[in-house]
Swiss-Prot record:
Subcellular location: Cytoplasm; Preautophagosomal structure membrane
PTM (free text): Conjugated to ATG12; which is essential for autophagy, but is not required for association with isolation membrane. Acetylated by EP300.
Keyword S-adenosyl-L-methionine: no
Keyword set, alphabetical order: Acetylation, Apoptosis, Autophagy, Cytoplasm, Immunity, Isopeptide bond, Membrane, Ubl conjugation
Coiled-coil positions: none
Bilayer disposition of the protein: Peripheral membrane protein
GO cellular component, one term: phagophore
Assembly and binders: Forms a conjugate with ATG12. Part of the minor complex composed of 4 sets of ATG12-ATG5 and ATG16L1 (400 kDa); this complex interacts with ATG3 leading to disruption of ATG7 interaction and promotion of ATG8-like proteins lipidation. Forms an 800-kDa complex composed of ATG12-ATG5 and ATG16L2. The ATG12-ATG5 conjugate interacts with RAB33A; this interaction is bridged by ATG16L1 and promotes ATG12-ATG5-ATG16L1 complex recruitment to phagophores. Interacts with TECPR1; the interaction is direct and does not take place when ATG16L1 is associated with the ATG5-ATG12 conjugate.
GO molecular function terms listed in the Swiss-Prot or TrEMBL record: Atg8-family ligase activity
Modification sites for N-acetylmethionine: M1
Listed name of the protein: Autophagy protein 5
Sites of the Glycyl lysine isopeptide (Lys-Gly) (interchain with G-Cter in ATG12) crosslink: K130
Organism for this UniProt entry: Pongo abelii
Membership in a protein family: Belongs to the ATG5 family.
Length: 275
C-alpha cells in the first residue's frame, strides 16, 4: 500500500466529544450527573463505555439494572456499527458534544442485537475482517495469519494501540504489484432515508481498461441518487470518517487509508444540511 501514515493516524485518533445522560425513566437513588467522554471514531460503543456504565450504576439499585443500551434522539444506537459511522449517519449536522441517552431497561429487541460480553464484539469484528479479506484476497491473507495475529488485531483495537494494530493490518492492505489493487473493494453504503440497512455489492477498484475506479464511479453504479440529483442541486453529503472525500478520489486509495479497522469503507449518504 502507499504509505500515507499521517492519514492512517488521523483516522485512528479521530475523537467525538460526547455527553452521556441517563434516561429520565430510569429509577435512581440520587440525581445522575452527565458523563463526558471522547469517543474513538474507529471503535464500538459497547467496547469503550465501561466507565459510563459504572458511573450511572452508582446511583441505581441493583435490581433496576439490566443490559445497557444507548439512544440518540429516539434512535437506538447499534453497537455493532463503528462509532464514527453512527455519528456521521445520525448526528453529523448537530452541535457538539454528541448527546447520547443511556438506558438500563426496556431493551429494544426489534432494533438492537444483544451484546452480552466483549467476546460478542470480538466475534463480530473478526467476522467483518474475514469477509473483507474474502473480497480483497480470496481470504488468503487472513487465513495465512496465525491465531496470535488475529488476537493482535483485536487487542490493538480494544486497547487503542495504533502501532500494534497496523503492524498486522498492513498485510491486509497489500496486493500484487501487477494487479493495481484488491480483487473487490469492501464497502457498505448507509442512508438514513431508507429502511435498507446498507448497500453492499461486488465492485472492482480497477476498470477493464486499467483505469482506477473512483468514489464517484462506485456511487454512480450502486447508489446513483446520491450523486445525480434530478434538478442538478446537490441534495446529499457523502461522508467517511466525518469528511467529504472528493468524488474523484481513487477507491483503492480510500480502501487502504479510510477503511475502519474492520477493513470496510463505511460510507454515509446524508441529506445536505438546509441551514
Amino acid at each position: 500500500m502507499t504509505d500515507d501514515k499521517d492519514v492512517l493516524r488521523d483516522v485512528w485518533f479521530g475523537r467525538i466529544p460526547t455527553c452521556f445522560t441517563l434516561c429520565q425513566d430510569e429509577i435512581t437513588e440520587r440525581e445522575a450527573e452527565p458523563y463526558y467522554l471522547l469517543l474513538p471514531r474507529v471503535s464500538y460503543l459497547t467496547l469503550v463505555t465501561d466507565k459510563v456504565k459504572k458511573h450511572f450504576q452508582k446511583v441505581m439499585r441493583q435490581e433496576d439494572i439490566s443490559e445497557i443500551w444507548f439512544e440518540y434522539e429516539g434512535t437506538p444506537l447499534k453497537w455493532h456499527y463503528p462509532i464514527g459511522l453512527l455519528f456521521d449517519l445520525l448526528a453529523s449536522s448537530s452541535a457538539l458534544p454528541w448527546n447520547i441517552t443511556v438506558h438500563f431497561k426496556s431493551f429494544p429487541e426489534k432494533d438492537l442485537l444483544h451484546c452480552p460480553s466483549k467476546d460478542a464484539i470480538e466475534a463480530h469484528f473478526m467476522s467483518c475482517m474475514k469477509e473483507a479479506d474474502a473480497l480483497k484476497h480470496k481470504s488468503q491473507v487472513i487465513n495465512e495469519m496465525q491465531k496470535k495475529d488475529h488476537k493482535q488485531l483485536w487487542m490493538g483495537l480494544q486497547n487503542d494501540r495504533f502501532d500494534q494494530f497496523w503492524a498486522i493490518n498492513r498485510k491486509l492492505m497489500e496486493y500484487p504489484a501487477e494487479e493495481n489493487g484488491f480483487r473487490y473493494i469492501p464497502f457498505r453504503i448507509y442512508q438514513t432515508t431508507t429502511e435498507r440497512p446498507f448497500i453492499q455489492k461486488l465492485f472492482r477498484p480497477v476498470a477493464a481498461d486499467g483505469q482506477l475506479h473512483t468514489l464517484g464511479d462506485l456511487l454512480k453504479e450502486v447508489c446513483p441518487s446520491a450523486v445525480d440529483p434530478e434538478d442538478g442541486e446537490k441534495k446529499n453529503q457523502v461522508m467517511i470518517h466525518g469528511i467529504e472525500p472528493m468524488l474523484e478520489t481513487p477507491l483503492q486509495w480510500l480502501s487502504e487509508h479510510l477503511s475502519y479497522p474492520d477493513n470496510f469503507l463505511h460510507i454515509s449518504i446524508i441529506p445536505q444540511p438546509t441551514d
